[in-house]
Amino acid sequence: MINEATGQMQGLLAAIASKKRQVNLFEQNILPALQKNYQVLQLGYEQNTGELFELLDAWQTLNMTQLEYWQQVQDLLTLQTEMDKTLQQN
């Protein structure tokens, strides 16, 4: 029983660490780069040097990636909840 709980905890801790790295990548690299790209294309469109479809594509990519980010955050919170439940059971 103790070995099973220990194994569960180790698995959850590894999954949480991995998910935290993924969330951090979104926060530090991916989302800022997509936001900057969208802003640059928006400025270009406002100055009549960019295409509307490029701007819309950047907007869609940014929004879809933000949704993926929030999914990763939800997954992280779910893992943390599972860990709390495992700790309470033992």
Where are the language model's segments positioned?
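Metallo-beta-lactamase
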Residues: 72
